Design a protein with these regions (language model features):
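A short helix->loop->beta-strand "cap" motif at the edges of active sites that frequently abuts
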Residues: 74-75, 101, 147, 174-176, ...
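Glycine-rich phosphate/diphosphate-binding loop of Rossmann-like nucleotide-binding domains
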Residues: 57-75, 187, 191, 195-270, ...
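Ligand-binding pocket scaffold of soluble enzyme catalytic domains
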Residues: 12-14, 23, 36, 51, ...
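Glycine/serine-rich phosphate-binding loop and adjoining beta1-alpha1 elements at the start
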Residues: 2-48, 81-215
Length: 426
């Protein structure tokens, strides 16, 4: 286990950081008005009363506001980290000490500690799971099957997790319903695009202090995360190249003004390469062998599988750490390749993750989906479900309201026209 101090039922790095953590939580709350509105209603109505909720999420100030909202709704919340490097230790301390939320998370924890913390959450016998990458659900199905009958349903935050869970459902392995929060329009159009775009650039600059203007910047993957990252890199003056395996997305990248080519072709000229795919070994040995001396590579997709770290290690004769989140690998042929954040999520390891304003919508979806599960779980089929449209639209409405933005509404005449098939060319 990582050497940590313990507070009550929690496992955090330093309980004395709770005051600092509370200040971070309060600062994030300023930018999360939708979640605040939901929390105030939850405190009155208690829709989650008595529900044991096990969450495996990035332990950040934004996540803390979600956990506090769920507790206000009556849930017994237990929280562990969904990435060994993403935890904000002051926030973990504040949740444990000042909010009484059992929290198991230490920034930089080793693999054994990471999985022991997941087990600690499972030890609470959760009735509802809330995941970011599906590690909690996977561990529950693989090693704690005696608990499955107690789980009524769960939610999943990320693209990677949704892919895993749909694979489980396809194989008949999934034993309770899941709502794919990632599929909400108010999640992936904003969190994935604007959140990942900004926070990845933030992590890159904090880790390296590199100037982006004039650099050749390769974005691997052109989903919503890739779109956001390419846009932000382009805005800072980088020459952006996109690599893709999907012809439609590749075509979209071309139409958006980027050069598109295979990674093997882009690698020799790349100054910076960042993966945002959710797949394994996107940067593989063949690419590593083509990178020029001094290339910087990083991952902002999920887990630490997108870069073939074993191949880099095999090609390396020396590894140094010139900066906190930089590992410089000197290869046998004399080139040096710089790997950021151990190949883990750059935006959460080297920076602070997505801005609170976009997480406001993502976590509003999480909270409202938890309420939906509490009310309707008996009617949910054993499958991976989309977020109910009424929840998605309500989150958008509340966000616009909080921003002071008004929109038009359809007139009765317009509604009647849209519902009719009889009117045509006149």
């Amino acid at each position: 286990m990582t050497n940590v101090l313990k507070v009550a039922e929690s496992d955090v790095a330093d309980p004395s950081l709770a005051g600092e953590g509370q200040r971070l939580i309060d600062w994030a709350a300023r930018e999360m008005p939708v979640l605040r509105i939901i929390r105030e209603r939850f405190a009155r109505e208690r829709p989650l009363e008595g529900l044991r909720l096990g969450a495996c999420l990035h332990v950040t100030s934004e996540t803390a506001n979600l956990a506090i909202t769920l507790k206000a709704g009556g849930a017994h919340v237990s929280l562990c980290a969904s990435n060994p490097l993403s935890t904000q230790d002051p926030v973990a301390a504040a949740l444990a000490r000042q909010h009484g939320i059992p929290t198991y998370a230490v920034k930089g924890e080793d693999s054994a500690s990471y999985y022991s913390h997941i087990q600690a959450v499972l030890d609470t016998h959760p009735q509802l799971t809330m995941d970011d990458g599906a590690d909690l659900v996977a561990e529950l199905h693989k090693g704690r099957r005696e608990l499955l009958d107690e789980v009524i349903a769960g939610t999943e935050e990320t693209t990677t997790g949704v892919i895993r869970l749909r694979a489980m459902a396809h194989d008949g392995a999934l034993k309770f319903p899941i709502i794919a929060v990632n599929e909400a329009l108010t999640k992936h159009l904003f969190d994935n695009r604007y959140g990942t775009g900004q926070s990845t650039i933030d992590g890159l600059i904090r880790a390296t202090n590199v100037l982006l203007a004039g650099k050749t910047f390769v974005v691997c993957g052109y989903g919503w995360c890739g779109r956001g990252l390419a846009s932000r890199a382009n805005g800072l003056g980088a020459h952006v190249i996109v690599t893709e395996v999907d012809p439609t997305r590749a075509l979209e990248a071309v139409m958006d003004g980027y050069r598109v080519m295979p990674l093997a072709e882009a690698a020799p000229s790349a100054d910076i390469v960042i993966t945002v795919t959710g797949d394994i070994n996107v940067i593989d040995r063949s690419s590593i062998e083509r990178f020029k001396d001094g290339a910087i590579i990083a991952n902002s997709g999920h887990f630490n599988d997108e870069i073939n770290l074993a191949a880099i290690d095999d090609l390396s004769v020396e590894v140094t750490a010139p900066r906190t989140f930089v590992q410089s690998h000197r290869l046998r042929d004399g080139r040096t390749i710089h790997v950021l954040a151990e190949g883990r999520l750059l935006n959460l390891a080297a920076a602070e993750g997505h801005p609170a304003a976009v997480m406001d919508m993502s976590f509003a979806n999480q909270a409202l989906c938890a309420e939906h599960i509490a009310k309707h779980h008996k009617d949910m089929a054993l499958a991976v479900h989309d977020v109910p449209q009424e929840i998605d639209r309500e989150v958008a409405r509340l966000k616009l309201q909080a921003m002071g933005v008004s929109i038009d509404t359809l007139t009765e005449e317009q509604q009647k026209y849209l519902a009719s098939w009889e009117s045509g060319t006149t």
